[in-house]
Amino acid sequence: SAHYLVFDITMFIAVVCFFYCFNGIFLKNDKYWGLRFITPALFLLIFPSIFFTSAGLIATATNYLFPLVAFVIGWYCLEKKGLAWLVLSFPFLILACMQEQFTIFALITFSFYLLKDWFKKKKVNYNYLVGTVLAFIGTVSAMVAPGSAHRNLVETKTWYPGFDKLSLVVKVAKGYMETNRVLFVTSELTIIYLLLITILVLSLLKRHYLASFLSGSVLYTVLSNRLGSTSILTAVQRVIDFQNQQPITKFSFKANLYPITIYAVLLLVITIAIFILFEDKWQATSAIVILAVGYAARMSVSLSPTIYASGLRTFTPLIFSGLIVVIMIYREFIDKIGNRLFQ
């Protein structure tokens, strides 16, 4: 129909703008020109065509893809100098912050870069300050808006009866379990393999054998479990199966202690491997923070009764942060190894 045609054209233009602005943020230096052609391929790899169709193309793209695009365009504008660019960022950041997950993503990301500039340059980056304020307003708005409470009430009855009776700690614990189940046990996201393989290859090239061992161990654990072999995640799956047999409002920390611990160890190992990989520790810290921001944005779904109904689309911020870190690792390769290889 004509409506779908207009929507498809709009989505195509939005994605083109996304790639242009993404490359403008992370690959602005001409020595990274080759990576600019890789970005679209990586995007299609980690966001396959069916990813944004789980709740219908228009609904899913409107709720997740367009806020992602708006956030990147707004971020690109903040990276530019001049009042005109700052003003231009407003509508895009406001649109992005109307989606709760990207509000959190923007708030933590811009706050970090604001602090980073302060510690490194001893001056305030007013663009990031404005971005932080806008994201903070968006976060507060999402928390106090009357419509949020009503929607939460309706969704509780529909998707998770008894959700309102769970404590905050239990909600977060359930979100933690579900997030890591998808990452490590069922391994449904391509980004986890791409990230681990990227870390492993670069660490071997740089002869950082500890990082190689750490990333290789996690990759082996995830792959072996995916292929049906016995691993430390086998027992995790059994605990999950047991938990699924319990009433949906019941959660025992004692019964789930093993998977909680294993997930924490896997996350810690990945964090250490990334930190070791970068020679510039500010870059290492930035990569870890960006990955943590995506994880936190996904974890925010813990506070929603649709936690088990919303599907993989709620992992969009986490996948996006993984893409950023992968690109940062590729940049590290060019900075430290690529020049020597091609001389």
Q: What is the role of each PLM region?
A:
Residues V72, W85-T109:
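Membrane-interface alpha helices of multi-pass inner-membrane proteins
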Residues L35-L78, S252-I272, A297-V326:
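Membrane-interface micro-motifs in multi-pass membrane enzymes
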Residues S1-L5, Q101-I104, W118, K123-I274, ...:
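Transmembrane catalytic cores of multi-pass membrane glycosyltransferases
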Residues I9-G34, I73:
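Transmembrane-helix motifs of polytopic, lipid-linked glycan transferases
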Residues C77-I94, Y126-V130:
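Short hydrophobic alpha-helices at membrane interfaces in multi-pass membrane enzymes
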Residues C21, I73-K80, T109-D117, L195-L202, ...:
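Transmembrane alpha-helices and membrane-interface helical segments
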Residues L214-G216, L267-L268, F275-L291, Y295, ...:
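Signature aromatic-anchored transmembrane alpha helix within multi-pass, membrane-resident enzymes
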Residues D30-L35, K81-V87, V124-N125, H208-Y209:
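Membrane-helix interface segments
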